[in-house]
Amino acid sequence: VLAGITREFDDKCMDVFLALDLPRAHYILGKLSGFMLAALLTAIIVSLPLWWMAEPGAALQWTLALALELAVVAAFALFCAAAFAQFAPAAVLTLAFYGLARGLAGLQLMSAHPVSGAGSWQQEISRALVDALAWVMPALHRWPHTAWLAGEAPAWMAFAMDALQGLVYVALIATAAMIDFHRREF
């Protein structure tokens, strides 16, 4: 995602796209659609061995959850690549986003139960900041669950809520990318 978009900026292919009589949003939506399709195909290919070992419902749920996770990260990578137009800052921010979204549950646990300084105002502020961050970041640590593959019955309603959350994040990130790309002067 990052290398392809930054290469288009560096090779001046973007000038050719912008010369066409198409809205800039079509470029972002087209790229996002392609990246989401690639995320789905990647999730299917990666999960093929699971279909022989796990229950079919659990394998399907795990595959779809992985595809949603990859779609959220691909949308954020597209946003970063379009915003920065350089590989290094976009890659660092995308990796930081993914690491934070994956590790936020651990940060919440550590801030709620500190080793020392429990009850201090610094600990309360750090816990409040981590909790506030958890409200705006996608909960990638919740999907896909390994327990689904080990015999735990998949809860389709909980998965539907996680899928809705993933689709909302993809839509929000795509909207931010379109707004940023529209305001940019080439």
Where are these regions (language model features)?
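Transmembrane helix boundary and interhelical loop/hinge segments in multi-pass membrane proteins
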Residues: V1-L18, L32
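Membrane-interface capping segments at transmembrane-helix boundaries
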Residues: M178-F186
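Short helix-kink/termination motifs in transmembrane helices of multi-pass secondary transporters
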Residues: E8, L40-I44, A74-A75, G103, ...
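Secretory targeting signals
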Residues: V1-G4, I28-A90, L109, W156
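Terminal transmembrane helical anchor/hairpin motif
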Residues: A96-I179
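Alpha-helix N-cap/start motif
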Residues: R24-A25
